[in-house]
Amino acid sequence: MKDKKVIVTGGMGFIGSHLTEKLLENNEVTVIDNEATGKIDNIKHLLENKNLTIVHESIIELDLHEIFKGKDYVFHLAAIPSVPRSVKDPFASNEANVTGTLKVLIAAKDSGVKKVIFSSSSSVYGDTPTLLKREDMPVNPQSPYAITKATGEMYCRVFQELYGLPTICLRYFNVFGPRQDPNSQYAAVIPKFITGIMNDESPVIYGDGEQSRDFTYVKHVVVANILSCESNETGIFNIACSRRITINELVAYINEILGKDIITENIDSRPGDIKHSLADISRAGKFGYNPVGDFRDELKKVIQWFENKRNNAV
């Protein structure tokens, strides 16, 4: 992608900041983010770039029409991205993730945007009995967060069918990488485990640790966003690596890389959590998505990032 004018909602977030960084290499980027879950620190190295514009407000509060006018594409990542947080406060999740998405779609339709790329989630599948998740399977949301993402997908489909707005929905599977926040009470498992084991703290595992995830390095997600935007494809696509890692294996890998032998603490499973998550990613091959990488090598890069961050803070 080159010489385009694009919007990234949630562009200060973990995934959004990586996408913003890549897009800025050849495009004009407007980031909309109120730092509800993102951080300006994630893009501080980009702030001097003359092709970057920042709108430091919530998509819920803004009139998006003026901002979207003259823009080519909208990458919609802004959300409250947490299953347990949605269980605790479903109303806030619905407002940010459903109302926010509807506002984005309306403004995109009215402003002549060429395509909306919507960040969805593998959580929409829930605990469907078939292990390998395919896009044509019925969704079975197990949490308010998953419901908001399934609803966002349906809004995207309806806006394409009724109004002719091209949309594509990317179902991310357990994304990890640098800049992921380990400190929130709703933090994802990989940054939480890395920082805990670095500090000789026992990782807390919900359940027996044999639940598995299709962990996806953030750079693959960035590539998927750009490829899907440039293509003529629309609809729903899984974005993952189609590899199955258990939580117990994850802890073992982190211990091995850090040269530690920290024992886990196992407690009861959480409401809304699912047992297994593994993607069939063949459909995303239609727009050229073909992730290549070794999980342990990617994990080493993330651990190195956290070690550098800790050393620089001293």
Enumerate the language-model features and the residues they cover.
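N-terminal Rossmann-like NAD(P)+-binding domain of SDR-like oxidoreductases, especially those catalyzing
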Residues: 1-175, 301, 309
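C-terminal substrate-binding subdomain of Rossmann-fold SDR/epimerase-dehydratase oxidoreductases
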Residues: 58, 197-314
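A conserved pocket-lining segment of Rossmann-fold NAD(P)-dependent short-chain dehydrogenase/reductase
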Residues: 86, 136, 166-167, 171-181, ...
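Active-site loop immediately N-terminal to the catalytic Tyr-X3-Lys motif
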Residues: 90, 141, 182-183, 232
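A short, amphipathic alpha-helix embedded in the catalytic core of nucleotide-handling enzymes
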Residues: 104, 159, 189, 193-196, ...
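Short beta-loop-alpha junction of Rossmann-like oxidoreductase domains
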Residues: 127-129, 178-180, 283
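Hydrophobic alpha-helix immediately C-terminal to the catalytic Tyr-X-X-X-Lys motif of short-chain
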Residues: 151, 155, 159, 189, ...
